Regions:
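Bacterial N-terminal signal peptides that target proteins for export
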Residues: 1-9
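Sec-dependent N-terminal signal peptides
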Residues: 8-16
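N-terminal signal peptide c-region/cleavage motif recognized by signal peptidases
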Residues: 18-20
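Terminal, regulation- and interaction-focused segments at domain boundaries
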Residues: 23-55, 160
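Stable alpha-helical elements in mature extracytoplasmic
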Residues: 40, 44, 64, 143, ...
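Compact, glycine-rich, soluble single-domain proteins
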Residues: 49-51, 59-105
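Beta-strand/loop substructures that line and gate deep hydrophobic ligand-binding cavities in soluble
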Residues: 106-137
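C-terminal partner/receptor-binding element of secreted or periplasmic proteins
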Residues: 125-160
């Protein structure tokens, strides 16, 4: 069985590779979960809440499958978790109000057609190199690294 660190390193490496077509440099990190969608969500949110003393919090969940069902459509599980740290995000939004359309960060817990559960989120490098500059904010490699370290912790708690 692949170690957590190796699995994380491979995920980050693959997300950083140049890609072709419309998905070029997507910045997405996707990790398999050994748990159900519900348990993966619970574990991811618990990991975030465990760091509330550092300012991290879960804002809400968006259940796309439930919305589809209410409209007579079928969709495998697709739940977006909106989470963040107002201590770090608020100062940036004070400088550029339009940043609020792209943050707080999100994670997607989803199930593929074969029933496998996945956790997907943006890398810190993507947020710092593409999202922040889009709003006229400078890239901050230190913040990107800290965000990636936090997400490594939360993702491992959720999926392993």
């Amino acid at each position: 069985m692949m170690s957590r660190v190796l699995r994380w390193a491979i995920s980050v490496f693959l997300a950083s590779l140049p890609q072709t077509g419309l998905a070029a440099d997507s910045g997405l990190i996707t990790m398999p979960s050994k748990y159900s969608v519900e348990v993966t969500i619970q574990r991811f949110e618990a990991a975030i809440r465990a760091k509330s003393d550092q300012g991290w919090m879960v804002f809400t969940e968006l259940d796309h499958a439930a919305a589809a069902e209410k409209n007579g459509l079928k969709l495998p599980a697709r739940t977006v978790i909106i989470f963040g740290n107002p201590r770090s995000g608020t100062p940036s939004m004070q400088k550029s109000p339009t940043l609020a359309i792209d943050v707080p960060p999100k994670a997607l817990v989803w199930q593929d057609d074969q029933g496998k559960v996945w956790l997907t989120f943006n890398s810190g490098a993507y947020l710092q190199d593409y999202v922040y500059p889009r709003h006229g904010l400078p890239s901050n490699p230190g913040a990107a690294k800290a965000f990636d370290e936090f997400l490594k912790y939360a993702a491992e708690q959720a999926t392993d």
